[in-house]
Amino acid sequence: MTGNPGTGKTHTAIGLGIKACEQGYRVLYTTIPYLVIELKESNSKQKLRTYQKRFEKYDLIIADELGYISFDREAADLLFTVLSLRASQKSTIITSNLTFVRWDEIFGDAAITSAIVDRLTYKAYLIDMEGDSYRLRETLRNNGTDFETVVK
């Protein structure tokens, strides 16, 4: 799921997660920055495989906010490994404020970016959440400001 900030990516992903829970699926919600921190800490403590196994028990993982921070090589490799283990086996929702063509800005390496995009998009539904920020629109409305005059 890609799109500008405030277009409903997280809201939609959480809604899908709730629906999956209601149908008996095991769901985990996390942010990409938090996931990367956890992976790096597990790796430094020689407990990476134990941490990775934790993800295998979830039918759906929602990984929110890809694109707000860049990764060093270790983080990119660790994230690639976790996502690769799930590819074509279990469901994963990734939300990002960047389109795929800009993901090399996050990962800093064209080869790993290409591999991650390839694995994530295989048999995937791609959703582009176009539009303006719902949060900004609501804030302006609450302040009595016309959204159209601010964004022009």
Predicted regions and their residues:
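Post-Walker A helix-loop "phosphate-sensing" segment adjacent to the P-loop in P-loop NTPases
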Residues: 17-30, 40
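Short basic/glycine-enriched coil/helix segment immediately N-terminal to the Walker B
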Residues: 25, 50-59
